[in-house]
């Protein structure tokens, strides 16, 4: 990762980040549930300018028999960045990164999905990054968790995600693209606070042992807030469907 000083970019000044946030501040977060009527479950999640749409179909019988698992449902995840999601031109064909992140998101969700209740079926999760400004994988995990809940898939708990970065020696929560580009480290984390499980933990860059422990604690505090927002989005959706009755 290139240092911001070498690039002439100042990302931390007087304790505030380039967009005015304090180190532990999230970007403005917006969540909507049930926005695609042809899907069994759907959600739109926004962290600042990063926008991810999730759609869930299933449980359903697979078209190809090799997807069948005798004791549980197969969870299939497709992460895709829309060609217009970044400033650079992008091929519509799946890239190596998209294939890798599809696997990352699937593995972050599998610990909470009660797939054993639907043997010999598949649950498909489609994730479309509509706009990318950092933190797309953790936003995708969050959107997928919401869409699974909206589809009525039994889950042990909701999963939320956030990335912690190290910028000019300062640990910060919910990094955007500029911070990711010029930061010294980036640590995406996903967790299910209600059952005390971490389902995703990656690190790009170098942190000391103390920095790692601090960054993880910061991530988990932020994820607590993200999951509470998920619960509120689900509650609001059910109230709207039920005509506003508690």
Swiss-Prot record:
InterPro entries: ExoRNase_PH_dom1 (IPR001247), ExoRNase_PH_dom2 (IPR015847), ExoRNase_PH_dom2_sf (IPR036345), PNPase/RNase_PH_dom_sf (IPR027408), Ribosomal_Su5_D2-typ_SF (IPR020568), RNase_PH (IPR050080), Rrp41 (IPR011807). It is found in: Cytoplasm. Signal peptide: none annotated. It comes from the Archaea. The keyword Nuclease applies. GO terms for biological process: gene expression; rRNA catabolic process. GO terms for molecular function: 3'-5'-RNA exonuclease activity; RNA binding. It is an enzyme of class 3 (hydrolase). Keywords: Cytoplasm, Exonuclease, Exosome, Hydrolase, Nuclease. One of its GO terms (cellular component) is cytoplasmic exosome (RNase complex). Its EC number is 3.1.13.-. Catalytic component of the exosome, which is a complex involved in RNA degradation. Has 3'->5' exoribonuclease activity. Can also synthesize heteromeric RNA-tails. Component of the archaeal exosome complex. Forms a hexameric ring-like arrangement composed of 3 Rrp41-Rrp42 heterodimers. The hexameric ring associates with a trimer of Rrp4 and/or Csl4 subunits. Belongs to the RNase PH family. Rrp41 subfamily. This is Exosome complex component Rrp41. It comes from Aeropyrum pernix (strain ATCC 700893 / DSM 11879 / JCM 9820 / NBRC 100138 / K1).
């Amino acid at each position: 990762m290139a240092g911001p000083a070498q690039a002439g970019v100042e990302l931390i000044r007087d304790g505030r980040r380039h967009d005015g946030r304090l180190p532990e501040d999230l970007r403005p977060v917006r969540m909507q549930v049930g926005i695609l009527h042809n899907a069994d479950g759907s959600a739109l999640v926004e962290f600042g300018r990063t926008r991810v749409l999730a759609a869930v179909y299933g449980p359903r019988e697979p078209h190809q028999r090799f997807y069948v698992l005798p004791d549980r449902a197969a969870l299939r995840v497709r992460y895709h960045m829309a060609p217009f999601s970044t400033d650079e031109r992008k091929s519509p064909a799946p890239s190596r990164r998209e294939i890798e992140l599809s696997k990352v998101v699937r593995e972050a969700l599998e610990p909470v999905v009660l797939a054993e209740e639907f043997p010999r079926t598949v649950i498909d999760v489609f994730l479309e990054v509509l706009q990318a400004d950092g933190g797309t994988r953790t936003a995708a995990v969050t959107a997928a968790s919401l869409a699974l809940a909206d589809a009525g898939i039994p889950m042990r708990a909701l999963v939320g995600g956030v990335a912690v970065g190290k910028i000019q020696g300062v640990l910060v929560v919910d990094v955007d693209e500029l911070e990711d580009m010029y930061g010294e480290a980036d640590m995406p984390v996903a967790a299910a606070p209600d059952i005390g499980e971490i389902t995703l933990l990656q690190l790009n860059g170098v942190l000391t042992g103390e920095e790692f422990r601090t960054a993880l604690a910061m991530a988990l505090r932020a994820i607590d807030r993200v999951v509470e927002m998920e619960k509120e989005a689900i509650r609001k959706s059910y109230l709207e469907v039920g005509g506003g009755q508690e």
